[in-house]
Amino acid sequence: MGLTAHEKQLITGSWGKINAKAIGKEALGRLLNTFPWTQRYFSSFGNLGSAEAIFHNEAVAAHGEKVVTSVGEAIKHMDDIKGYYAELSKYHSETLHVDPNNFKRFGGCLSITLGHHFGEEYTPELHAAYEHLFDAIADALGKGYH
């Protein structure tokens, strides 16, 4: 099931407050620190051997910003997220061989990060809307595996 009109409104109304660099760095850092096996996809990033190294790594920050910027673009295509991510899904599947479960894991890390940055504004209703969006994105990115 796609996102409801109300969920879309909540997301578009709050996304403008996002600092892609800060959110991306923290969310990707959380993923790499919490799920260390995901580091294998980022071997070119240098030292990822500790939380401190991860959270101070400029390559992590840059890639995190790129991913969060992509989510921002996907928000403009909420009626066709699968179409928007079709090529990226194929790339992650056929070239990078990323475990599709990692997309869901990243969505969880991103949701936690948004909660950290939004504070009390990250209501249960807004949280649920973002979770629905991140599930749709994870599903779209996993499409290249089917």
From Swiss-Prot:
Gene3D superfamilies: Globins (1.10.490.10)
Residue ranges of coiled coil: none
A Pfam family of this chain: Globin
GO biological process, one term: hydrogen peroxide catabolic process
Presence of keyword Magnesium: no
GO cellular component: blood microparticle; haptoglobin-hemoglobin complex; hemoglobin complex
GO molecular-function terms, A-Z: haptoglobin binding; heme binding; metal ion binding; organic acid binding; oxygen binding; oxygen carrier activity; peroxidase activity
Disulfide-bonded cysteines: none
Family to which this protein belongs: Belongs to the globin family.
Quaternary structure, from the entry: Heterotetramer of two alpha chains and two beta chains.
Protein name, as recorded: Hemoglobin subunit beta-2
Source organism per UniProt: Xenopus borealis
Gene name of the record: hbb2
